[in-house]
Amino acid sequence: NILKNKNNRELVNIFFARSNIFHRKGQYEESAENLVNANNMKLIMHKSEVDLLIDKTKKLKISSDNYESNNQNFENYSMSIFIVGLPRCGSTLVESIISLNTKVKDLGEVNIFEKSYREYKQSEKQKNLSEIYWEKLEITDSKTSTTNKWLFNYQYAGIIAKAIPNAKIIHCYRNPLDNILSIYRAHFATG
């Protein structure tokens, strides 16, 4: 039996591979059974932090409600495009299309804004959040726009909208059932 003497990571790989094989053969019940096994095994290996994420999101929502809009004139600063959405919703495609423009720098999935926000909170607000963020971007040309599709930018959307004058937020949305199935079938490296 191929499953004997395998560690959890190897079992996850086997279950996902089996699921894909059964799916290609049109044997959807067997495919689903292996998907359930793979995802259950992944939950054993990587505990869900959903409660922590929900709590953090709620706290940041309250912070954004209390955050004053930055009305300073920042014409000399670049446009920051934040792309938010669930994994497997099309955000990578959107970022790729936007980044075809030579005046757009693709930052990928970096948490520069979260780091800037933490620094802003620790500095007791002596420095402007948008200035901290733009310094971390290290963009010297104000005509260069940036895209950032870090998975957790949605938590900061309210603060981004108020703190970064030249920010644009693009919410990528896909049918939730399609999205859930796509995430469930995807074998991400972690989590």
Predicted regions and their residues:
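PAPS-dependent sulfotransferase catalytic domain
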Residues: 101-107, 111-123, 140-191
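Alpha-helical solenoid repeat scaffolds of the TPR/TPR-like class and their adjacent stem/linker regions
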Residues: 1-140
